[in-house]
Amino acid sequence: METIVLGVEPRVIKKKNAEKLRKNGIVPGVIYHKGEETIAISVNELALRKLVHSAESHIIDLQFPDGKIKRSFIKDVQFHPVTDRIIHTDFQLFSAEEIIELEVPVAVSGESAGVEKGGKLLIILHALTIKGKPEDMPDHLVVDVTALEIGHSIHVKEIPLDAYTGLQIMDDPDTPVITVLASKKEAEATPEAAVATAS
């Protein structure tokens, strides 16, 4: 997994200060670690947005003005309900041997058999919560959809982790991750396809 350096600055926790920061393109946030005091920080909105909307997960080295670096990952992001701008973010620190839970993006591999027959591929879960050591975390989880037919789904429990050592998916095993839906034209031509449920 790639490590990204992100500049941050300490901040004073006040509502008016947070609003002023946001108006100037700065996002307020906090850094926390079990057993340690929470640190209030601010980070550039554009730099943070690139990480949040990336197709890959990252380890983040938070760099302070004095040069100190704290290794972390993004634990939570809050968005404005109307503008969808990032308004707050939580970073969690960790040690090399610590077991963490990290959201890892899902990447699709192969051409679905159902898509070749006119179906539409739908990714239901764009990221999965993975538990393991930071050094073992992948940039993304590759899911092969080659055999996926119309009306069928790939569930969490069907995603193999053979290529990843010591990792565990924490999401509900029965949750569908990817499915193939019948296209409107296909559904009209084949009534059974219209009522097919993800199985």
UniProtKB/Swiss-Prot annotation:
Keywords: Ribonucleoprotein, Ribosomal protein, RNA-binding, rRNA-binding
Molecular function terms from GO: 5S rRNA binding; structural constituent of ribosome
PANTHER family per UniProt: RIBOSOMAL PROTEIN L25/GLN-TRNA SYNTHETASE, ANTI-CODON-BINDING DOMAIN-CONTAINING PROTEIN (PTHR33284), RIBOSOMAL PROTEIN L25_GLN-TRNA SYNTHETASE, ANTI-CODON-BINDING DOMAIN-CONTAINING PROTEIN (PTHR33284:SF1)
InterPro entries membership: Rbsml_bL25/Gln-tRNA_synth_N, Ribosomal_bL25/Gln-tRNA_synth, Ribosomal_bL25_b-dom, Ribosomal_bL25_C, Ribosomal_bL25_long, Ribosomal_L25_dom, Ribosomal_uL5_bac-type
Gene Ontology annotations for the cellular component aspect, listed alphabetically: cytosolic large ribosomal subunit
SUBUNIT field: Part of the 50S ribosomal subunit; part of the 5S rRNA/L5/L18/L25 subcomplex. Contacts the 5S rRNA. Binds to the 5S rRNA independently of L5 and L18.
Free-text function comment from the UniProt entry: This is one of the proteins that binds to the 5S RNA in the ribosome where it forms part of the central protuberance.
Domain of life from the UniProt record: Bacteria
HAMAP family: Ribosomal_bL25_CTC (MF_01334)
Keyword RNA-binding belongs to the record: yes
Organism expressing this protein natively: Pelodictyon phaeoclathratiforme (strain DSM 5477 / BU-1)
Family in the record: Belongs to the bacterial ribosomal protein bL25 family. CTC subfamily.
Protein name: Large ribosomal subunit protein bL25
Keyword Metal-binding found: no
Lineage: Bacteria, Pseudomonadati, Chlorobiota, Chlorobiia, Chlorobiales
UniProt cross-references to SUPFAM superfamilies, sorted A to Z: Ribosomal protein L25-like
GO biological process, one term: translation
One Pfam family matching this protein: Ribosomal_TL5_C
